[in-house]
């Protein structure tokens, strides 16, 4: 069997390399834990036992000298000593690998959408760009100078020219409160806020221990011992485990997280910021839906920042309209909303802004579709059974890419049974719910209440996508 030739691979067209990197999904080496999804799907998680072999001198040296440097990011994987040992072996050379660097170059050309963007982090007493895989494990890291030189291919670059680097993430979920403040302080000093295109919130603000963190004195902690760093990281990990509960109550409308507050106050300086990601229902209510903002003066996202945002991603919550209405109209330029791992979504309780374009719902347990059918029944003055008799089957052979044809039937209204004016009124009722929405995607949805009714214009232009939704039996096109 011929060996792999990296030089020939790098000579391939970028489209082919892009597909290869897409399927790698950010896993560049053999040292990676099980996907996080397994923890949610299985009641029993098999943990590796203690290593039965005797560690080599090299492994002992790596653990003694290298592990303390990365302990902040590795201690959550201490359940698997073999995994950490293997990771330390890769740590020396993986960041210099030609295929890894080429992957980041292609990812940069696609604006960080191929394998996700890099994140600002603080490692070995220096601000760095890091890439975390889907299991939140650190893969590689670079200084900003290395990233521009090796990835962006600008050897003689002007350090003040940041126009071509504006898609970096700032993810407080992968940072301790102390590191959040260190990163933000250095980003401000080096005038690097313009490189941030996305901010991710996910730490739990209900845990009181974080209140005691002194933001002003956090920089004095740079030379803290590895053991104290591990303890801080473990406390941070425990906080993240609580934030998925998504409890919203009158007694819990105070924003107390130092990490979140410090980040919010720096967001106006992030001129390239276009996307916000929020994990957890309470943070969503406070930061996105603005319930309880009067109880948090100076701790909410400003109007200037809201006008810059064109994409919001929400995940890990029971429902987004628990307080009555999910109002996104304050986000004037919001164009895309992604809802992931939400237990229940009522589309009738969501209000979109006037420039809204795209809605994606994936890994959702239950969706209540717009009450379009109910309004059409009133317009036609017929009951549900009579209305169903007006359905005719659509020729769905050309939509195999967008629908599960084994389970989903595409139907339309029989125009021969109703006059043209009535049909146009039915179309108007459909568009009254969709408004400016011109793309909708459903993926891994368990159940949908109300019949799914979509506009003919969106359906014919393939802007209605349904994947892996076995419970969706039919879609009505009007």
Curated annotation (Swiss-Prot):
Q: Which GO terms describe its biological process?
A: kinetochore assembly; septin ring assembly
The GO molecular function terms of this record are: DNA binding, bending
Family annotation (InterPro entries): LRR_dom_sf
Report keywords, A-Z. Centromere, Chromosome, DNA-binding, Nucleus
Task: Return the Basic residues bias intervals.
Answer: 231-240
Chief place where the protein resides: nucleus
Which CDD domains does the record cross-reference, listed alphabetically?
Ctf13_LRR_LRR-insertion (cd19611)
- Spans annotated as Disordered: 206-251
Composition skew (Polar residues), residue ranges: 217-230
Q: Which GO terms describe its cellular component?
A: CBF3 complex; kinetochore
Record's subcellular location:
Nucleus; Chromosome, Centromere
Q: Fill in the subunit field for this protein.
A: Component of the CBF3 copmplex, which is formed of CBF3A/CBF2, CBF3B/CEP3, CBF3C/CTF13 and CBF3D. CBF3C interacts with CBF3D and SGT1.
- What does this protein's UniProt record list under function? Acts as a central component of the centromere DNA-binding protein complex CBF3, which is essential for chromosome segregation and movement of centromeres along microtubules. CBF3 is required for the recruitment of other kinetochore complexes to CEN DNA. It plays a role in the attachment of chromosomes to the spindle and binds selectively to a highly conserved DNA sequence called CDEIII, found in centromers and in several promoters. The association of CBF3C with CBF3D and SGT1 is required for CBF3C activation and CBF3 assembly.
Q: What is this protein called?
A: Centromere DNA-binding protein complex CBF3 subunit C
Instruction: Give the species this sequence originates from.
Output: Saccharomyces cerevisiae (strain ATCC 204508 / S288c)
| Gene (name only) | CTF13
